[in-house]
Amino acid sequence: KHEMLKVVNFLDTILPKDKPRYLMGVGTPADLIENILNGVDMFDCVIPTRNARNSQLFNYDGKLNIRNSKYKDDFTPIDTNGFSVSSEIYSKAYLHHLFKTNEVLGLRIATEHNLKFYIHLMNQVKIQIKNDNFEKWAKEFLERYNNE
């Protein structure tokens, strides 16, 4: 990861600023933010859906593996940031149960959650860039996200 960031940072110095920049196969929330800081405009990755199918959910505080036994009796919502109705309706315990029993609904809820989180995250990026606040916001996001 460190090498990739070094290469992208170097490419930022030599690629034209007025052309779109595409980075393929990079897709954790932290990777997206770090690479946007380095001038990348577009991404293409399966991480939100693949990780959802493997019981991993993303949120602003990092990621959580919903199969983990600590969620068995956790009746708090999956997320409360308001970007997904299903994330506020379903509890972590319920989603944990769905994954443990191999119920397909669990995959669907987790996938919807991750995709809506990514959409919300990228909308926040756009807002922060428009407000000329992206670097500060990105630093705060990365500190919070990587501090899981």
Question: Where are each of the predicted segments found?
Answer:
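Glycine-rich phosphate/ribose-binding loops and adjacent secondary-structure elements
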Residues: 1-78
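C-terminal extensions of enzymes
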Residues: 79-148
